[in-house]
């Protein structure tokens, strides 16, 4: 079978003309394009469901602990410095190494952020043996050696860059203490100025025995101070342990116990969110087992709540837990949207770790 061969010159002429035309047009200067956008704000064009307007609240950059949550004591249970399970500490780089090889900033195991000695005659040690309960993994051992010249000794809680107090306002203190001396030693607890030179409240005195006991007191501030501290001191040589040291302003949002800062909560409320999504995104993903919130571990007394080193490289108390979030949503008239971990950690932080 023979194929017929032919050339269609009309088609060739058409193609050549198109190519030449395109070349010529590309050589022409571009003409300015003038566009006009008209916005008609009067009247409803497309209805928008008002329930689509809401907020996401996440524990990041101390947005909760040290922010919205009204707790004034940083590292109240002395858990900062306890590495998560299967995450060894690299002392040379001050990082944790996760099971999948990702690193996250950390600190030395003997560090006690948020706390310091009041004078050199005091030694402080994180203790992993004397514990209030099985939920807490460390307490603070305080050893004071005093003399007529050295004066009192003890520890200072600095809060989050200072503890802001106002004259006449009340602050609720609670803490666990346990003594080690044959004869109970008196320890004094007070609010003082940042240098611990001037007392700014009444003084609370206790003499802890051999058993753990929770003590409670309500201070009344005698002066305004933006950066006060909480001091726990002894005038004689003494050895004692502390744990779950908490200080709350009595005036929380809506007067809730274990509640929110009224100024920040009022700002959130002023946005009138129809829903609140909590407790975050990457915070919920975590980076290994035990480094993301599980709702049932954020309930109950603050001494029973699980603490962990979060994905943003600081300690999380879970003091603002599932109940407190629901309470906040109720107080603000917002629908709660709780974010749960699916069992897979953040994909952006090396290969996934499945729990």
Which residue stretches match the model-derived regions?
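Bacterial N-terminal signal peptides that target proteins for export
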Residues: 2-14
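Prokaryotic Sec-type signal peptides and long signal-anchor helices
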Residues: 13-16, 82
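C-terminal motif of bacterial Sec signal peptides marking the signal peptidase cleavage site
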Residues: 23-26
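Extracellular and organelle-lumenal recognition/adhesion modules and their flexible linkers in secreted
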Residues: 29-320, 327-339, 350-355
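Active-site loop/turn elements of alpha/beta-hydrolase fold enzymes
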Residues: 341-343
């Amino acid at each position: 079978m023979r194929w017929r061969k032919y050339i269609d010159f009309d088609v060739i002429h058409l193609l050549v003309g198109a190519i030449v035309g395109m070349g010529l047009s590309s050589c022409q200067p571009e003409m300015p394009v003038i566009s006009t956008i008209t916005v008609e704000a009067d009247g409803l064009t497309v209805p928008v469901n008002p329930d689509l307007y809401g907020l996401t609240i996440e524990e990041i950059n101390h947005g909760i602990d040290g922010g919205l949550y009204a707790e004034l004591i940083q590292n109240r249970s002395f858990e900062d410095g306890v590495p998560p399970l299967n995450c060894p500490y690299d002392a040379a780089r001050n990082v944790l190494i996760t099971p999948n090889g990702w690193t996250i900033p950390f600190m030395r195991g003997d560090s006690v952020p948020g706390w310091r000695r009041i004078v050199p005659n005091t030694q402080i040690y994180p203790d992993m043996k004397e514990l209030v309960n099985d939920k807490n993994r460390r307490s603070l051992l305080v050893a004071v050696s005093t003399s007529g010249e050295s004066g009192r000794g003890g520890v200072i809680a600095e809060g989050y860059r200072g503890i802001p107090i106002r004259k006449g306002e009340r602050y609720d203190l609670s803490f666990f203490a346990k003594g080690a001396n044959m004869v109970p030693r008196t320890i004094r607890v007070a609010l003082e100025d940042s240098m611990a030179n001037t007392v700014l409240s009444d003084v609370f005195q206790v003499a802890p025995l051999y058993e753990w006991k929770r003590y409670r007191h309500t201070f009344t501030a005698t002066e305004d101070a933006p950066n006060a501290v909480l001091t726990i001191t002894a005038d004689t040589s003494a050895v004692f342990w502390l744990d779950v040291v908490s200080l709350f302003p009595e005036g929380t949002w809506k007067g809730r116990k274990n509640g929110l800062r009224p100024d920040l909560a009022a700002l959130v409320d002023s946005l009138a969110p129809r829903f609140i999504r909590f407790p975050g995104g990457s915070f919920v993903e975590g980076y290994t087992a035990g480094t993301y919130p599980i709702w049932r571990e954020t309930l109950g007394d603050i001494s029973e709540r699980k603490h962990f080193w979060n994905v943003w490289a600081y300690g999380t108390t879970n003091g603002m837990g599932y109940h407190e979030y629901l309470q906040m949503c109720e107080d603000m008239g917002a629908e709660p949207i709780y974010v749960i971990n699916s069992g897979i950690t953040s994909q952006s932080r090396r290969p996934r770790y499945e729990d």
